[in-house]
């Protein structure tokens, strides 16, 4: 694996094996990233199987073209550089109207976190950016410097679940009135200064939740995941499966809600029987989320918050 795009794949075998791979199936890796899941999935496919890989980061696709070359040479891989919110439309362009399985590994990939200039990390000094797609218009700089007080409070509380959202938004408002806030370390210092001393003694970086909130806003992560997972459920063939790995409670709650909605009969209570068209579309493969093993947690610190949910299509 190239040094500039090093990524340790989380829940590698669990997420792929739970898809119950058919050798001649059509599959989608909605979040190509470091291509670890794709490489393992492709190793389970026969010559007639095919994998469509989505990523909005050109560097991820360039890296995967090296890593997956043997499968590319056999014509088994198609790369789609786009946000996975356009899943259905982009697959349709390739003549795909039904898939046997799809995998999501939500959140920021390790290379994006580790590339200082991308501005995702509060640990390294960099311009405020946080775009997963470097061609996108909205940046963290614009969020921090142009959103009004109420909008900042809204995203900090909604996406960061930080109880000091108002105090942090006020600090930002005061600081940017003097000069724009332009770097990650400037922002991290402001966040830290807005929190009481006893809060700073707690485990974890004081800026973590606010950086998460800004990143989610910049990339509309929850909106994209919501739209894409709903499209994926529709695209699944009968007995097809969907695996979703999440890294924070907002993503997990969204996935749990979408799976519950699709796995619950849409029928009024008291009916003597449920018509086929009102029966659930999904069946949960595992009622509780699947967590990384102790061995994986020891080997990869970033796996600690990971959860995997899997469902199977039972009605078209």
Curated annotation (Swiss-Prot):
Q: Name one GO molecular function term.
A: rRNA (cytosine-N4-)-methyltransferase activity
Say if the entry is tagged with keyword Transferase.
Answer: yes
Q: Which HAMAP family match?
A: 16SrRNA_methyltr_H
What gene is behind this protein? rsmH
Q: What is this protein called?
A: Ribosomal RNA small subunit methyltransferase H
Can you state which reaction this protein catalyses? Answer: cytidine(1402) in 16S rRNA + S-adenosyl-L-methionine = N(4)-methylcytidine(1402) in 16S rRNA + S-adenosyl-L-homocysteine + H(+)
What's the main place this protein lives? cytoplasm
Example GO biological process:
rRNA base methylation
- InterPro entries referenced in this protein's UniProt entry, alphabetically: RsmH, SAM-dep_MeTrfase_MraW_recog, SAM-dependent_MTases_sf
Positions bound to S-adenosyl-L-methionine: 35-37, 55, 84, 105, 112
Q: Write the lineage as a comma-separated list.
A: Bacteria, Bacillati, Bacillota, Bacilli, Lactobacillales
Q: Which residues form a coiled coil?
A: none
Q: EC number(s) for this protein?
A: 2.1.1.199
Record's function text: Specifically methylates the N4 position of cytidine in position 1402 (C1402) of 16S rRNA.
Family per UniProt?
Belongs to the methyltransferase superfamily. RsmH family.
Q: Which organism is it from?
A: Streptococcus equi subsp. zooepidemicus (strain MGCS10565)
* Localization, UniProt: Cytoplasm
Which of UniProt's keywords are assigned here?
A: Cytoplasm, Methyltransferase, rRNA processing, S-adenosyl-L-methionine, Transferase
Cite the Pfam families for this sequence. Methyltransf_5
One GO cellular component, as annotated: cytoplasm
